[in-house]
Design a protein with these regions (language model features):
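C-terminal motif of bacterial Sec signal peptides marking the signal peptidase cleavage site
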Residues: 14-18
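A residue-level marker of the well-folded mature domains of exported/periplasmic proteins
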Residues: 20-419
Length: 419
């Protein structure tokens, strides 16, 4: 904030502000010193989607080091942010500073934690006051947690990611500036389409029902998917929601969001197993779960769902251990830790009597959380496990989503600068 140029008569205000005092947010005050300080709420340090969002934010704001720009986004949360510059629509080149950042993990070990974000925002605001010019969050839940801080500055810009219905209402009321929609309907429909194709033994399961109509009457996913054969991933693009277009999406039920180009197919009902990494996750509960429940009938699935604690894999793996061979025709896994894919495959290989010599055709599809190595890179090797003929990942394009979030922030700042 620009305090040094304030009149002498405002000395008391200067002293208060320099000690982290707060007043309602305004662009005039935020931009006065030509420095934009932001605070970043990180979901999970070693999560590739979290890292991709962090990379997108820092790249857009100029705070990702030049030496890191050519690297994979997977290590972005472990990188050190640098002082950057950003030229806005008013012709001013602002200095950009990541004044605070941190993983939002609770005492039980659960990451992406909304309540922790509330405490974090309170602490950072108490420390810096109006010296923070805006907040950015790796997801909507933490953004909502932040605005719930007891000392939250009225009008403080904050940007989320996930397009939770509650966040859309906050965008309508001006408390959150924007979010990124993961295209939940396309993710849910795409996951079930791919699982159905594999169960039914359809040729070209990543094409049938995606770029061409389903051979078994399930229609065609309306959103474009991009298939990467190297790591067996099926990715759908994200899109931005701000005050300009929020009315197109707010207040919609899951039934409103169902892809009408997907239709009820003709193959028999089968039993499938599906895990959710955290029973308390806002995005999964409000966006994904209701869609899956509707799509289950469309794809003739009898779904057994299991819900994790967000801290470790124990609840999901113990449930999986209890399954018997023949209980399920497909397994759809939403991991807590993205490095845990191999442990799930080991359990399933034992259950299904699968070996490299006698691989199983039972599909195993990871969803929304992509398998990574300890270094945070997409784990192409685990996705080629020779014990399984059908291993895939279905989710959103994390890198494209991170870039969109970064651009959304810059667009907002440009609008403020032009006002």
């Amino acid at each position: 904030m620009k305090k040094s140029l304030l009149p002498i008569v405002a000395l008391a205000t200067v002293v208060l502000a320099s000690c982290g005092g707060t007043s309602d947010w305004s662009w005039a005050e935020a931009s006065a010193d030509e420095t934009l300080n932001y605070a970043l709420l990180i979901g999970q340090i070693d999560h590739n989607d979290s890292a991709a969002r962090t990379a997108g934010i820092r790249t857009a704001l100029g705070t990702r080091a030049a030496a890191d720009l050519g690297k994979s986004t997977s290590s972005a949360n472990s990188e050190v942010a640098v002082e950057g510059t950003l030229e806005l629509a008013d012709g001013v080149t602002y200095k950009t500073v990541e004044i605070e950042s941190g993983e939002q993990k609770n005492t039980a070990g659960a990451t992406w934690d909304q309540q922790t974000a509330t405490s974090t925002a309170e602490n950072w605001t108490a420390k810096h006051g109006n010296d923070i010019d805006f907040f950015v969050s790796n997801n909507d839940g933490m953004a909502e947690g932040a605005i719930g801080a007891s000392n939250w500055i009225k009008g403080m810009p904050i940007f989320g990611y996930d397009s939770n219905e509650s966040t859309l209402q906050y965008i309508k009321s001006g408390q959150i500036m924007g979010t990124i929609n993961q295209n939940a309907s396309a993710q849910a429909g795409g996951l079930y389409m791919l699982a159905r194709n594999c169960i039914d033994g359809v040729a070209n399961p990543t094409v049938n029902g995606f770029s061409e109509a389903s051979a078994n009457g399930y229609g065609k996913i309306g959103s474009e998917y991009n298939y990467n054969e190297t790591n067996e991933s099926m990715l759908v693009n994200n899109f931005t929601i701000t005050a300009d277009n929020v009315d197109q999406y707010a207040g919609k039920t899951s039934a409103d969001l169902i892809d009408t180009s997907v239709t009820k197919g003709t193959t028999e009902t089968v039993k499938v197993w599906q895990s959710y990494y955290n029973a308390a996750d806002t995005f999964l509960n409000s966006s994904m779960k209701p869609l899956f429940q509707l799509y289950a009938d469309t794809f003739n699935f009898d779904v057994t769902a299991t819900f994790g604690n967000g801290a470790d894999e124990s609840l999901a793996t113990s449930n999986l251990e209890a399954a018997q061979k023949g209980d399920y025709d497909a397994f759809m896994i939403n991991m807590v830790k993205t490095t845990a894919a191999a442990s799930y495959l080991d359990i399933l290989a034992t259950k299904l009597d699968a070996t490299a010599e006698t691989p199983t055709n039972t599909p195993v599809i990871f969803w929304n959380r992509q398998a990574t190595t300890e270094a945070g890179e997409v784990d192409a090797d685990v996705m080629k496990d020779a014990r399984f003929n059908n291993i895939y990942y279905v989710g959103f394009d994390a890198v494209q989503g991170g870039q969109l979030q970064g651009q959304m922030i810059v667009d907002y700042l440009n609008a403020q600068a032009k006002a």
